[in-house]
Amino acid sequence: MLDNEKITLAHGAGGRVMQELISKRILSQFSSDILEKFNIEVSLADLDDSAVVNDIVFTTDSHTVKPLFFPGGDIGSLSVAGTINDIAVMGVEPLGLSCAFVLEEGFPISELDRIITSMGTSSKTAGVPILTGDTKVVERGSVEKMFINTSGIGKRTEQLDKNIEIVKKYRKFEGRWLKDSNLNPGDKIILTGSVGDHGIALLSYREGYGFETELQSDVWPLNKMLQATISVGGIVAMKDPTRGGLANTLNEWSEKSGVGIKIDEQLIPVKPAVHAACEMLGMDPLTIGNEGKAVIGVVPELAEDVLKAVKGFTEGAEAAIIGEVKAQKEQKGVVMETLMGGRRIVDAPAGDPVPRIC
Ligand code: MG
């Protein structure tokens, strides 16, 4: 990079440009020999949903969604559910959150009240307390209205240990955590519900396209559903397909696990309004961000049992087994069998097709 280069929106979009910023500029400065004093089983360099240090699961996320209120949620519910989900997909129980507000001078107290009420409701729904926080106010014009950062911690459970024991009955499994790099050929891929609801509901509302009348964000804390699935056993990896959508999640899994992934378009739930909006806007629902969905990698022998557990929850009612993992010699990257009977490569989006949704 040249000295006069500046940050662009793409640097925060979750795609390749952001990955480059992290790997070239950030990781090199944050890795040092002090790390050796700690038992770090999932590190910053893993770029997973959370890190794990001395058996504590830890994650953080800043929320800059625009507008602050949208169909189905607001920045408050999003900031609570988003961080809980990043902990929950590690297969552990979230213990608590921090919450830090950056507010612009002049922000209406009535709106702040609505947002805080919404955070409280999400926290109660999930059964995860907000334990510590911070509030800063900056001069008018120096931020846009409000940003919220939430961090969260989680702890390992007996169920996670049992889940991994069960995996080991069926195949080799290394390590003690559900990581993006854990997939093996033969594993099945479960998606817990329809894709694109959050991104399209928000975009449509923001731009006035009209689809928001029949569509809401899926923002929801998934910890209870995911804990129930872990109790079934056989799960090797989980991820919430947020920025970059399902396409990004599956490509991360494929790259980090060194496997191919085959999915079937016919099996992927897409709501009619999302389908219609994507047709109109020339977008791919697989690349649109979700805030209340998880992708689960599971040994084939237990895929139906895990699916059944997911479907027992309202938030997982539309879940489906959408594909399976292939050996790289058989298939590289992520490939989808299309409704037309063809095959297409599913790439990770380079940037964010819908900016400012989380
Ligand atoms: Mg995540």
Segments from the language model and where they lie:
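Acidic, Ser/Thr/Pro-rich beta/coil linker or hinge segments at domain junctions
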Residues: F313-C358
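Short Gly/Ser/Thr- and Asp/Glu-enriched loop/turn motifs at secondary-structure junctions
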Residues: A45-L47, I288-K293
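Helix N-cap motif at beta-to-alpha junctions
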Residues: V298-E304
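Glycine-rich phosphate/pyrophosphate-binding loop regions near the starts of catalytic domains
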Residues: T8, R16-L191, D197
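Aromatic/hydrophobic pocket-lining residues that form π-stacking "cages" and hydrophobic walls in ligand
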Residues: T83, M119, L250, V274, ...
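Short amphipathic alpha-helices in soluble, non-transmembrane regions
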Residues: D305-E315
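Active-site-proximal betaalpha loop/short-helix elements
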Residues: A10, G14-I22, E104-G106, T213-N290
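Short, Lys/Arg- and Gly-enriched loop/turn segments at beta-strand edges
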Residues: G196-S204
